[in-house]
């Protein structure tokens, strides 16, 4: 090889190219570590009705590792999405030392259980309920049932509309039986949903009879049990049931 000029030239060229690569890599590493590229600004925009940008920024900045070039954008996105009210975050670099973050927040539909909220998309999330702008419906159900409960809430709102009542509480029991508390104060036991017609048929029976029910007992119906196959039972304020002793006095 040492007597072969062509091979020596090739080897020298290869070593020279390798040296240039090493120097270029070292130069790049030196450059990207300069203080000028340390992250100095996090710009937050997007849907932030319930999101306080300074609070989010303060909660995330200590979890960001690296500078403009080395920060992991996926890890940064996850950090933002772990903040209260944040449903989705997109993060991008802004030359030379900033991140631009666009946030999408959860749209609350109501409360879920004791300490969670549920979104209009049926997603559970945790946030300060004191930040809610209005009294929202209450929901509860078995694990994994949030989307089903939210869908049924919308159905109940439509089915009970003819009696001018809206759902304020919707509960799905561990046995998958439905209970609804309406805005007129009435609690409705609907039972289990055996097929797609079970719930609308039961509610329709009550709706059809509602004029007669309110004419007889007034509008203050406290409870309705719709689980019967061909009818329903109600309890109205002031309704009194006779005991055997009462019957004997008549």
Curated annotation (Swiss-Prot):
Q: Which residues lie on this side of the membrane: Cytoplasmic?
A: 1-11
Q: Where in the cell is it found?
A: Cell inner membrane
Q: Its topology with respect to the membrane? A: Single-pass type II membrane protein
Which residues are in the POTRA domain?
37-106
Give TM regions. 12-32
Q: Where would you say this protein principally sits, based on its record?
A: membrane
Record's keyword annotation contains Nucleus: no
Which Gene Ontology BP terms does the record give?
Answer: cell septum assembly; FtsZ-dependent cytokinesis
Single GO cellular component term: cell division site
Taken from the record's topology, the Periplasmic segments are 33-250
Please name the Gene3D superfamilies in this protein's record: Cell division protein FtsQ/DivIB, membrane protein fhac
UniProt similarity note: Belongs to the FtsQ/DivIB family. FtsQ subfamily.
Q: What is its biological role?
A: Essential cell division protein. May link together the upstream cell division proteins, which are predominantly cytoplasmic, with the downstream cell division proteins, which are predominantly periplasmic. May control correct divisome assembly.
Instruction: Describe its assembly.
Output: Part of a complex composed of FtsB, FtsL and FtsQ.
In Swiss-Prot or TrEMBL terms, this protein is called Cell division protein FtsQ
Identify the species of origin. Burkholderia pseudomallei (strain K96243)
